[in-house]
Amino acid sequence: VPYYRVDITNKDEFSKLPNDVYAVVDLAGAMPARMKGYNPYKYIDVNITGNLNILEYCRKNNADRILFAQSFGDIKDYGDKNPLLRVDLPRKFSFTTDHTIYVMSKNFAVDMIENYHQMYGLKRFIFRLPTIYLYSPVDTFYVDGVERKIGYRLLIDRAIAGEPIEVWGNSSRVKDMVYVKDFCQMLYKALFVNRNCGYYNVGTGVGTSLLDQIKGMIDVFGENGKKSNIIMRPDKPNAPQYIMDITPAIQELGYHPQYNYLEMLQDFKKEMQLHKINGGGTDIM
């Protein structure tokens, strides 16, 4: 597959790309988890100007459709009262955090895509993403502009080492643990579906409690005779909770998740092992 490196904020660089495209899968974007410090101009330059350049590329080259990755930051605040997040929930997000302009920029990108859909007939498929779980050798991200270990990677590391693991807050709070390979399945189906548009939550439609998440990590990654002890800490803050309603994706795309939580962890472990075999380090035996 040919690879082109393009700065999407520079419209002139799009001349590098082929002009006989059927579909554009737009996963480009600036996000808080990958931003050192806080530079809101990046969100405007990349998520708005950059995506406008992508839309113009689609228009000029008569692309049939665009697939776009939206953040679930526009509705995730509903989850604290009712974890089931429907696709059609009105936007609701905080205006007081360093995520605000990020969420606004992604919302505006979605609105720009709708404009090109209605004005030029560009078919559009929007995918609202929560955390997508996958193995990567990069196990850090940024919180409030400061680099930290990704939470679930820290828990997996403790399970591998057989170290005690604390369960913070209400252990029954649930999260939709969607694997990257199921997200890819959804994208693939949208590439060829006979529809003009769609708006989909990415997920499994199933919630896994925090306690079951940690038990699963211990079962899959812990060594026999060296399993982590679980320490309940209800005095600590609660984890976020949400379940993505995937009904439209099931009905319109024929999407069906292939990985439940434990199957995801098992495949995650295989990917870690392959990374080590291929010379990527000493993650896990």
Please describe what each predicted stretch is.
Residues 52-101:
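Conserved Rossmann-fold NAD(P)-dependent oxidoreductase catalytic core, especially the SDR/UDP-sugar
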Residues 24-28, 66-72, 127-129:
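SDR active-site strand-loop-helix element
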Residues 8-46, 77:
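NAD(P)H-binding glycine-rich loop region in Rossmannoid oxidoreductase-like domains
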Residues 80-83, 114-174, 180-185, 189, ...:
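NAD(P)-dependent short-chain dehydrogenase/reductase
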Residues 31-34, 72-79, 130-133:
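Active-site segment of SDR-like NAD(P)-dependent oxidoreductases
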Residues 159-285:
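C-terminal substrate-binding subdomain of Rossmann-fold SDR/epimerase-dehydratase oxidoreductases
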Residues 101, 105-108:
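Active-site helix of classical SDR
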Residues 22, 41, 45-52, 60, ...:
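Conserved internal alpha-helix in NAD(P)-dependent oxidoreductase domains
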